[in-house]
């Protein structure tokens, strides 16, 4: 495990916010590497694994937005089902020439293999170190995720992170996916703190933006050196790994 500490860059507000009293993490893309399925995808679909994993993720997020903006949430589906639907779409789009059909047993087998892999995504290497440090400093922690509780619990247990997370918060409780305000409000109600006193951490720029709009202090973990969303609201800070969370919670002397 690398011990190199990245320096977080302050962004945006000129008035320093109050020190946060708790931290919430996004799960998929932040704690868990959603592209770690690419190796298996490449084995199943030679030459298309990386493209498949990217399209799968993009379509997954697109589907969350589609069902959230439907009238009164009439078309809401749990995240696991949207993830499966997105994978099915991605395979059909990229592997059309492979002569698969939805009823084909081999097609279904490959979907199941990739879905099983998604249950236990790889965690980023610094995660345990950071979560242990937060626990040692007495900082309450939680996950606020589009994933359902069963998905999140299994992912945490399989990665060994479960003992270091105090709260598992799923948008399934309100049936509105991020960036809907009702999704972010779950963090406040669970922690019993206003958003301004909570740090929200995400590696997804759109998620960091939505959390900032809601009033959270935010850390955007920009692992791949991407530009931030061009909508006029920067995160509180930008970092390059989860270790930058610890800069918000210095050790007391």
Show the residue positions of the predicted features.
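Active-site neighborhood of HAD-like aspartate-dependent phosphohydrolases
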Residues: 11-61
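Short, acidic loop-to-helix structural element flanking the phosphoryl-transfer center
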Residues: 80-81, 100-143, 153, 181
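Short helix-capping segments at alpha-helix termini
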Residues: 45-49, 93-106, 136, 160-164, ...
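Alpha-helical elements of Rossmann-like donor-binding domains used by nucleotide-donor carbohydrate transfer enzymes
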Residues: 39-40, 55, 85-89, 113, ...
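A metal-dependent, Asp-based hydrolase signature
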Residues: 50, 63-113
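Asp-based, Mg2+/Mn2+-dependent phosphohydrolase catalytic module
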Residues: 2-20, 132, 144, 148-253
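Hydrophobic alpha-helical core bundles mediating ligand binding, dimerization, or RNAP-core interactions
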Residues: 41, 56-60, 83-84, 111-118, ...
């Amino acid at each position: 495990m690398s011990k190199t500490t990245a320096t977080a860059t302050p962004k945006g507000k000129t008035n320093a916010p109050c020190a946060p009293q708790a931290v919430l993490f996004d799960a998929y893309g932040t704690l868990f590497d959603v592209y770690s399925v690419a190796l298996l995808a490449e084995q199943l679909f030679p030459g298309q694994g990386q493209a498949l994993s990217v399209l799968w993720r993009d379509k997954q997020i697109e589907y969350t937005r589609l069902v959230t903006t439907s009238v009164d949430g009439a078309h809401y589906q749990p995240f696991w089902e949207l993830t499966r639907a997105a994978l099915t779409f991605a395979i059909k789009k990229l592997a059309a020439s492979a002569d698969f059909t939805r009823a084909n047993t081999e097609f279904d087998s490959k979907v199941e293999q990739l879905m099983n892999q998604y249950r236990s995504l790889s965690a980023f290497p610094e995660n345990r170190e950071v979560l242990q440090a937060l626990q040692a400093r007495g900082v309450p922690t939680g996950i606020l995720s589009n994933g359902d509780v069963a998905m999140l619990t299994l992912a945490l247990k399989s990665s060994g992170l479960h003992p270091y997370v105090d709260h598992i918060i799923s948008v399934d409780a309100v049936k509105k996916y991020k960036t809907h305000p009702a999704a972010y409000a779950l963090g406040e109600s669970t922690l019993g703190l206003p958003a301004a006193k909570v740090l929200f951490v995400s590696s997804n720029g759109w998620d960091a933006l939505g959390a900032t709009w809601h009033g959270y202090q935010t850390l955007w973990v920009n692992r791949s050196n991407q530009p931030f969303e061009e909508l006029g609201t920067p995160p509180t800070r930008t970092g390059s790994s989860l270790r930058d969370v610890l800069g918000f919670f210095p050790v007391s002397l």
